[in-house]
């Protein structure tokens, strides 16, 4: 495991690499927030590259300080929740990965009503990349916009829906679906 720096939300304003994107999602903020925060396995439904083995490693109820593990393109990613404002904000930092992609990483999601029963989803990402990730820098802004738009469409079509859960599967346990 490659450890990452234990940064906080302030890192978003000082990170060497900063990305941002906004997408409209035709679901209420409470539902979009639930898709992102309540069950890490959901990410496999709406983000390309993620599988459905994501799980919280800490007991519920989940919130600031909760830890989870996800897998993206076969890489294990361990995270700590930095912000949890039900229906409005969800943020986390990466604590470690099985690939040396970056020294630090923070993601911050804001879920705002769009005035028509939908959500304006804003994401900010701050990172301190290692060499391999630096090489991908030119495509990251368009890649983030594409991935977030695709996630929004998947959410609109209900490809994730779960209810708040205390997802306590252990790492390596296969999800029942």
PLM region descriptions:
Residues 27-29, 85, 114-116:
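Short loop segments at secondary-structure junctions
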Residues 31-33, 78-80, 102, 131-133:
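Short acidic, gly/pro-rich beta-turn/loop elements at beta-sheet edges
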Residues 2, 126-177:
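A conserved amphipathic terminal alpha-helix motif
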Residues 24, 54-100, 120, 153-162, ...:
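Glycine-rich portal/gate segments that line the openings of hydrophobic small-molecule binding cavities
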Residues 1-58, 176-177:
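Hydrophobic ligand-binding cavity/cleft-lining segments
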Residues 13, 96-149:
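Beta-strand/loop substructures that line and gate deep hydrophobic ligand-binding cavities in soluble
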Residues 22-26, 80, 110-112:
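Generic structural detector for well-ordered beta-strands
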């Amino acid at each position: 495991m490659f450890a990452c720096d234990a940064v906080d939300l302030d890192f978003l304003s000082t990170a060497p690499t900063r990305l941002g994107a906004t997408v409209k999602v035709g679901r209420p903020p409470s539902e979009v927030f639930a898709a992102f925060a309540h069950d890490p396995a959901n990410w496999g439904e709406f983000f390309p590259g993620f599988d459905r083995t994501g799980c919280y490693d800490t007991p519920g109820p989940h919130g600031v300080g909760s830890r989870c593990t996800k897998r993206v393109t076969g890489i294990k990613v361990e995270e700590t929740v930095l912000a949890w404002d039900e229906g409005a904000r969800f943020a986390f930092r990466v604590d470690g990965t099985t690939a040396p992609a970056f020294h630090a990483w923070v993601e911050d999601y804001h879920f705002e009503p769009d005035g028509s029963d939908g959500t304006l989803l804003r994401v900010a990402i701050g990172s301190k990349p290692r060499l391999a990730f630096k090489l991908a820098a030119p495509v990251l802004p368009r890649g983030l916009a594409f991935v977030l738009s695709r996630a929004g469409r998947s959410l609109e079509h209900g490809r994730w829906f779960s209810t708040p859960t205390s997802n306590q599967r252990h790492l390596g346990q296969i999800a029942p679906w």
